[in-house]
Amino acid sequence: MIDQAKAPRQEASPPSKFEHKVTYVPPRTKFAFGMTEIRDLAIATLLVSGVGLSMLGFELLNIQPLLVVLLLALFTSTFLMHEIAHKITAQHYGLWAEFRLTLIGAVITLISIISPFFKIIAPGAVMIGGTASKETIGKTSIAGPLTNIIFCMLALALTFVQPSSSPPSPFVVVAVVTAFFNAFIAVLNLIPIGILDGWKVFQWSKIIWALAFTTSIILISVLLAQYGSLLGFSL
């Protein structure tokens, strides 16, 4: 039981002549897209899809138009899920997060479309704002590549659903290309240099970075060893 002492009675203060109203409401961290973000994502998606098509071998360039459309949709999904994973994770920790196109990144990605050997996919990044610890930044950074690793594993597993044939069925082609594209983006982003995701993950946890990077390397190695000719690589 709590016995609360009564305070001495005080006279009410006179009413104030001043009034106030709320003129600023802090932005909520709910999951939403701004118009600038949508525009930048649309441009970046076109660039990424262009790089994806340029990575296909000559055998895949002669496939049915419907299959090309499906592959473009998968390239788009791969890129968007990577960036959205960053965004959702950042907002989960109460941070402001929106994707922004960067000029140098967009130019490098554009060059990668026409270059037969130089392939870098970095049209922009999810910008975050707010106070964040090294752990929060690390978890936000690993979210994108981890999403790609999961999608790669799922797509690779689908290749075992249908018996192998020569030439491979459209189903296998889509699964293999999807797996390879996800593995490629994961490996690229996990390189521990500069502004890439890998450097932020490495600074947070070297063990988690090593596990993620090693897994992505193994996945892309398996795909190249098993389906190198399908992907246009001579191994």
Where are the predicted features?
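Hydrophobic transmembrane alpha-helices and their immediate loop junctions
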Residues: 1-235
